[in-house]
Amino acid sequence: MSVRLAVPDWSLLVPPLIIVGTIVLLLIVDAVLRRPPARLLLTLAFAGQVLALASLWTIDWAQGATTFGQSYRADWFALAVALVALIAGALSVLVSAGYTESGLDPEGIGQAEYLSLLLFSVLGTMLVGAAGDFIVLLLGLEMSAVAVYALTAFARRRVTSVEGALKYFLLGAFASAILIYGMAWVYGSTGSIVLRDIAETLRTVVMPGQPLDPALLLALLLLAVGLGFKIAAVPFHMWTPDAYQGAPTPVSAYMSVVPKVAGFAAVARVLVQGLQPLSEQWTGLLGMLAAITMIYGNVVAIAQRDLKRMLGYSAIGHTGYMLAGLAAFTTGQAGDRSVGSVLFYLFAYTFMNIGAFGVIAWLQERGLGTTLDDIAGLAGRAPLAALTMAIFMLSLMGMPPLLGFYAKYYVILALIEAGQLWLAVAIVVMSAVSAFFYLRVVTRMYFEEPAGALQPARTPVLGLGLALTTLATLVLGLVSSPILDLVQRWSAALA
């Protein structure tokens, strides 16, 4: 009897394969040229991601085709995640320009390794977005996370960098084990690891209004713990402030966005697609996590004096806002609005947060530290840098007509339509609380005397990254409605 093996459709994998090729090319160039120019490596890394972005439009995402069985899904949701991940990765390469051009490490850990790890994490995030089963989803999450563990410790001579990386790694390992345990319980209850098959099985066994089977309840709680760590939701956030503060600033910029994209993509795939019949249970759980997370993140950020640590707690608060968007999920078109609002938030957050960390990196290149005292009177020393930082702070706060305002507005709108008024009010109140620490940055820059002159430095590539993020923050809010309509249609792929 002859056996015919299924042939994978490699055309669906062109974007991630381009990233793989770019990683290999970076390492080959580094090995052949010994010490290649930093600009060459930056150009290769940036061009590879731009090429991968362009290749996204060669795939017919509307078909929702699968390959490798049902493990890899090329649907609209996968496109949305890949788009955000590649944009964030490309911007992070630009923001890293000053850091890589300095040589990173005189003992040999340098540019090629740094950029390869960054691209490896982008690749993992793309796999999470396209995951059709638990195996690919877990593989993508770990690819993304392990690379960031290493990047966090790149400033290995600084104790805070190694400490932050070690804490991130250890807690991440525990969280991954818990996540796998939760997946095992789902498999034991449904007999499948394929997300769509899990949903179909649950629709036949879960009755509305009936108590949930203890095995499924345990699985849901374990998955919530594991995924909660990936997105830095309270109380699974302990690694975040130390990792953000200790990591090199370009890594902090990247870490604040791409792992969060991977985490929320995993939450959407697992809960919205795989466990959709349990939405009555998990929307309530996400609502409570969202409220606790946004309150804790914004309140604790007020006490921070270090800008990177403040942005770490700010990131926790923004995780709460995005969780609130998922808590608004209901079946049908309203569910598309819920997931669409979160995708739009991630898109907006990419520009705002990478831009804010980019300004800090720009200041460090000129001899300043990362505390509030270091930026005192910045408007008198570097007026353009102060203006750029002020734009990002106001956008993160949610000031209209900047991009961050529309991100919060669409989440609040989804909550109101879902009848979750208390969470909508919580977002408004916490946004007002966040004004305290965001505006404090602005007032320190504009209403205090300069402490001294900046050291001269040439960082044109970093400047380009800041220009792009600033332009996006200012302009994309004005065309936010069609972007939201688009991502809402893409979110329907999870149904």
Curated annotation (Swiss-Prot):
Q: Where in the cell is it found?
A: Cell membrane
Q: Pfam families, per this entry?
A: Proton_antipo_M
Membrane topology summary: Multi-pass membrane protein
Q: Which reaction does it catalyse?
A: a quinone + NADH + 5 H(+)(in) = a quinol + NAD(+) + 4 H(+)(out)
Query: Which UniProt keywords are listed?
Result: Cell membrane, Membrane, NAD, Quinone, Translocase, Transmembrane, Transmembrane helix, Transport, Ubiquinone
Q: Which residues cross the membrane?
A: 12-32, 40-60, 76-96, 117-137, 168-188, 216-236, 247-267, 282-302, 310-330, 342-362, 385-405, 419-441, 459-479
Superkingdom assignment: Bacteria
Does the keyword field hold Nucleotide-binding? no
Q: Which GO terms describe its molecular function?
A: NADH dehydrogenase (ubiquinone) activity; NADH:ubiquinone reductase (non-electrogenic) activity; quinone binding
**Could you say which EC number(s) this protein's record lists?**
7.1.1.-
Instruction: Please give the GO cellular component terms listed in this UniProt entry.
Output: plasma membrane
Tell me which family the UniProt entry assigns to this protein. Answer: Belongs to the complex I subunit 2 family.
Fill in the subunit field for this protein: NDH-1 is composed of 14 different subunits. Subunits NuoA, H, J, K, L, M, N constitute the membrane sector of the complex.
**Name recorded for this polypeptide:** NADH-quinone oxidoreductase subunit N
